[in-house]
């Protein structure tokens, strides 16, 4: 493999093997063909799958990039991009198609930065969460007479106001005591949400996502949780109702990573509005209930932000190349942010993987849990932290760990069974526990230690 420092690699290199995605709007059939084309051009590092159907039966396709597609490798984080949640906000959809082609192309070009990203990260790209709404908006095209035409799904529901409301539950718990993570869903949640929302919820419950971005249009700003205001205020002339999460500093940093890598988002003045550093707390801008980014944070291990990417919800075709060039580096840098903080394995005395162990950081009232393979990921900024792992039936263990800026710090926990109480405990598949084991490809073997000690450059 040639030694090509990523700092000097141009991000956009044309490959003689890959036909680039053209800068045009892609209707549903065209989108599907494009995803299949990218998959066929890079079959060893991609998997195309669907997470469900829209109201009108269109598949919600996801393109996965990984050196072992379809398999979760312990200590390798999962990250996702979601586009076109509002059917008439289309730039995210087109950017994600361009990104898919770009990752495939640059992997084949042996771009060291992209090679490392795909080898150390499992990336899931959902270009269109609302294909039915898109088709309605696309029938009008950029010259829209109705600003909201196609925004909702085929049942007329705004999908970003359709997730179970967990904020109210969390705000109550914050004052009165109660869980601060993985808040439960109501028993009837499946009957209360739309097919597209249900598909996404089942998707994010099935994979241990660590980081995510959700793409919108109509402004240019990186929006971070919470979206729902404690004061129940709605959009108005004054932004005074900031509703920070316990991870507010981290979320601001994630938002700034995107805004400052973007061509112009960080400048602040865009679309006739001003956001310092090109970022905003969601509720400080305007409060919304039942949004997707708050749901990710309160119900799963995933940290999600919302990216408003264009003043025009449906940009003209001739603007797409400029938008891609303005977003390309930001899209890559944001994916790389999943490799920060701490990660590790939670084991019992016999070195069996433990799933569902709770990882707490002193001073941050938001916990994460270990996944079904016993691995956990906790995004943190550089600093020194006191971290505790605990599981029912085991004595908790606390360590002090220093997190640096160059990549994740590996912190494993081996928990001893409590002598005073005995509880049933879940053990994750693997290490003699069954389940689907990774079958390494002999042509691309990796040293397992690389998963523990490195992240993208």
From Swiss-Prot:
Cite the entry's keywords alphabetically. Carboxypeptidase, Disulfide bond, Glycoprotein, Hydrolase, Metal-binding, Metalloprotease, Protease, Secreted, Signal, Zinc
Reaction catalysis annotation: Release of a C-terminal basic amino acid, preferentially lysine
Q: Which organism is it from?
A: Mus musculus (Mouse)
Query: Any note on cofactor binding?
Result: Binds 1 zinc ion per subunit.
EC number(s) per entry: 3.4.17.3
Cofactor(s) recorded for this entry are: Zn(2+)
Q: What does this protein do?
A: Protects the body from potent vasoactive and inflammatory peptides containing C-terminal Arg or Lys (such as kinins or anaphylatoxins) which are released into the circulation.
The root-end lineage is: Eukaryota, Metazoa, Chordata, Craniata, Vertebrata
* SUPFAM superfamilies named among the record's database cross-references: Carboxypeptidase regulatory domain-like, Zn-dependent exopeptidases
Give the positions annotated as glycosylation sites.
Answer: 400, 402, 409
| Family of this protein | Belongs to the peptidase M14 family.
Q: Which GO terms describe its biological process?
A: bradykinin catabolic process; protein catabolic process; proteolysis; response to glucocorticoid
Instruction: Quote one Gene Ontology molecular function term.
Output: metallocarboxypeptidase activity
Residues of the signal sequence? Answer: 1-23
Which residue stretches belong to region Disordered?
418-457
Q: Where does the UniProt annotation locate this protein?
A: Secreted, Extracellular space
Give the domain of life: Eukaryota
Record has Secreted as a keyword: yes
Any idea where the Peptidase M14 domain is? 24-338
A single cellular component GO annotation: extracellular space
Q: What are the disulfide bonds? A: 42-104, 271-311
Under what name is this protein listed?
Carboxypeptidase N catalytic chain
Q: Where is the active site?
A: 308 (proton donor/acceptor)
**Pfam families annotated for this entry?**
CarboxypepD_reg, Peptidase_M14
């Amino acid at each position: 493999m040639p030694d090509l420092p990523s700092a000097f690699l141009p991000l956009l290199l044309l490959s003689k093997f890959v036909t680039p995605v053209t800068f045009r709007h892609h209707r549903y059939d065209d989108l599907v063909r494009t995803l299949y084309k990218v998959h066929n051009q890079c079959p060893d590092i991609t998997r195309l799958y669907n997470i469900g159907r829209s109201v009108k039966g269109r598949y919600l396709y996801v393109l996965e990039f990984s050196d072992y597609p379809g398999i979760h490798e312990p200590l390798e984080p999962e990250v996702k991009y979601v586009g076109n949640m509002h059917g008439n906000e289309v730039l995210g959809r087109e950017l994600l198609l361009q990104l898919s082609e770009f990752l495939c192309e640059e992997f084949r070009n042996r771009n060291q930065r992209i090679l490392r990203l795909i080898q150390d990260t499992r990336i899931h790209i959902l270009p269109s969460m609302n294909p039915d709404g898109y088709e309605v908006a696309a029938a009008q095209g950029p010259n829209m007479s109705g600003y909201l035409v196609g925004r909702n799904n085929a049942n007329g529901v705004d999908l970003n106001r359709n997730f179970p409301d967990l904020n109210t539950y969390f705000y109550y718990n914050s004052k009165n005591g109660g869980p601060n993570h993985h808040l439960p869903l109501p028993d009837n949640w499946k009957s209360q949400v739309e097919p597209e929302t249900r598909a996404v919820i089942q998707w994010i419950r099935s994979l241990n996502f660590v980081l995510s971005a959700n793409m919108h249009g109509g402004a240019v700003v990186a929006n971070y949780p919470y979206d729902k205001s404690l004061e129940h205020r709605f959009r108005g002339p004054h932004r005074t109702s900031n509703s920070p999460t316990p991870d507010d500093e981290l979320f601001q940093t994630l938002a700034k990573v995107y805004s400052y890598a973007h061509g112009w988002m960080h400048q602040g003045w865009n679309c006739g509005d001003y956001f310092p550093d090109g970022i905003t707390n969601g509720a400080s801008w305007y409060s919304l209930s039942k949004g997707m980014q708050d749901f990710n944070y309160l119900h799963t291990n995933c940290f999600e932000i919302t990216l408003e990417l264009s003043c025009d919800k449906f940009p003209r075709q001739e603007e797409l190349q400029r938008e891609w060039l303005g977003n390309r580096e930001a899209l890559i840098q944001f994916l790389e942010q999943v490799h920060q903080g701490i990660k590790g394995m939670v084991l019992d005395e016999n070195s069996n993987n433990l799933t569902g162990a709770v990882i707490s950081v002193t001073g941050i009232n938001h916990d994460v849990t270990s996944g079904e393979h016993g691995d956990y990921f906790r995004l943190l900024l550089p600093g020194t932290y006191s971290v505790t792992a605990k599981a029912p039936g085991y004595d908790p263990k606390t360590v002090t760990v220093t997190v640096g800026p160059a990549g994740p710090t590996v912190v494993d926990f081996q928990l001893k069974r409590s002598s005073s109480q005995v509880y049933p405990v879940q053990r994750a598949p693997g290490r003699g526990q069954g389940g689907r084991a990774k079958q390494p490809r002999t042509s691309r073997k990796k040293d397992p230690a690389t998963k523990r000690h490195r992240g993208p450059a």
